[in-house]
Structure formats: C-alpha cells, structure tokens
C-alpha cells in the first residue's frame, strides 16, 4: 500500500486583513504593452521565458496598484518585470559578478538618456528604458525616493550573494533586517506616490515609517510561506521558516505557527500606527491618506497574486487558496548550472 503524500498546510495570514481584493481596470491593456516591451530584450531562453509568463508579474502590479493611472500602472508593471530579471540574473552568480551587474543598473538609472555601451549585460538597457519612461510622469519627490530605495534594494542583492557564497546563517532578527531591502517593497511603495508630492518631514514621520516597515515584514512572511515548498525541494534555505526551525530547534509546523503569530502582531502594529497618523492639513492629509491606503493594500494584492498567478502553485493556486493544503515536494539536488543555462545572460 503506497504511503500517504506529506501535506504542507499554509496558514491563512490575511483572513482578518480589512483591505479587500481590487484590480486596476487598465490591467489587460497595460500588461500587453509592458510584456511586449520586456520580451523585446530577449533576456531569457524560451524555457525561462515560459516560466516568466506563468508568473504574470503585471497581475501583481494591477492588484498592488488598483487605483493607479494608466501611465503609473505601466511603471508598476515594468518595475515588477525589472525585479524579476534582476533576480534571475543575479541569483546564480557570486557576489563579485552581482556587484558588476548592480553597478551597471545603478549607472543606467542615473543616466537614463545616455545610450548603454555595446556588449554590456542587458540589465542596463532594461533599467535605462524603464526609468526614462517612468520619469516622464513621476513627481520629483517620488523620483528621488524611488532611486534611494531601489539602489538600497540593488545593494541588498549583492549582500545576499555574499551570504550565499559563505553559506551565512541568520537569526530571525538579522534575516528580517536583510530581507527588508531585498524584497523590493520600498521602491514598490514609491510607485504609490508617482502622482503625489509629500514633503520629507511628513514622509519620514515615525508613524509613516512604521506603516512601511510592518507591511514589508508581512510581505516577507507571506512570500516565504508560499515559496517554502519549492525552496525546501531545491535546497534553498533563504526562507524565514528555515531560520525559525534552526534558531528555535522546532518542527516545520511550529515554525509555520510562529510565523503566522508574528504576522498577526505585525497586523496589529500596522493598525495602531495607521490610527496614530497625525494631521498636516487638508491638502497634505489627502495625499498621506492615498499613500497609506496604497501601502495597506500591498499585502492583500501580493497574497491574491500568489494564488492567482502560476508563480508558486502552477494551475492549482485557486484550489490551494481554498484548502490551504499543498503536497510537499520531494527534495532534489540543487543544480544551479541548469538554471544558468535557462537564464542565458544576454548582452547588448
């Protein structure tokens, strides 16, 4: 009699979150334009491009920015695609190669109207075109904050590669600290303010900082819960569940429960900070409200995308969203050389 397949239970961390699913009405139109633009770079092999299509990163943008103007949704879609290609190119490289790639992207963002040199990795041209289009409709304050946060994200990519190189082990505290920049939430929040002009003294108020921090850590937990199955099968331990199990010497079930409980604490802290937001006058308050509502929607949009796209569960996402159960994948030896062949790093 065959043994039963082990099942993984995913806690429903978003069951009490008051912000409900919404999607941008320009989704299909903007997705077609953004994906056509991205595919024109031929950044992936056919196999890797097929995986990209299943992920449907434009769906993530449409769920994360349901009230964005058409041109700002385009920026969001392009940004999600840019995140993906940077992740795919750097995830198989050591810290030195990642450093070179990151420097190219930073230079392209700082000089969006200058042509990129021939023979350069295609990341530079993708980033240059993305930013040249984005700044046409972005407020000056949002441009500055996007660059600050996106460069911090890029630097974290190099740090993550260095961690891989030396098989670094983290505590929950140090893991969350390095993932806050690496998950890409802060530049994603900058898209929320493309049409806004929030002064620095308001934007960096402690209550505002708390909102973005708590939402970011919610995103980290939710992403790690849904990606754990695939990562445990491939031997990738850069996941908060592995960190919890190692630090507290506990089972996977206990790690899941710990992560879900911490997620609930973050939700409560977020709501408290939301209620403590001061007033700066009608004009500023309306912009702050729009921005904060956008941050609050991000965890909901990300959660919906995790099950509606094929990123984590293929065509079983809706079923998993209902049952919260997924068969535990068998472990296999991690072979990064195969992934390198799939990525096929492209130059201009």
From Swiss-Prot:
InterPro entries: Isoprenoid_synthase_dom_sf, Terpene_cyclase-like_2. One of its GO terms (biological process) is isoprenoid biosynthetic process. Mg(2+) 3 binds at residues 223, 227, 231. It catalyses: (2E,6E)-farnesyl diphosphate = Delta(6)-protoilludene + diphosphate. The gene is STS-18. Its EC number is 4.2.3.135. Disulfide bonds: none annotated. Mg(2+) 1 binds at residue 87. This is Delta(6)-protoilludene synthase 18. Its cofactor is Mg(2+). Mg(2+) 2 binds at residue 87. Belongs to the terpene synthase family. The keyword Metal-binding applies. Pfam families: Terpene_syn_C_2. It comes from the Eukaryota. The conserved DDXXD and NSE/DTE motifs are important for the catalytic activity, presumably through binding to Mg(2+). Terpene cyclase that catalyzes the cyclization of farnesyl diphosphate (FPP) to delta(6)-protoilludene. The record marks 84 as: Plays a critical role in the stabilization of intermediate cation. A motif (NSE/DTE motif) lies at residues 223-231. A motif (DDXXD motif) lies at residues 87-91. (2E,6E)-farnesyl diphosphate binds at residues 311-312. Gene3D superfamilies: Farnesyl Diphosphate Synthase. GO terms for molecular function: metal ion binding; terpene synthase activity.
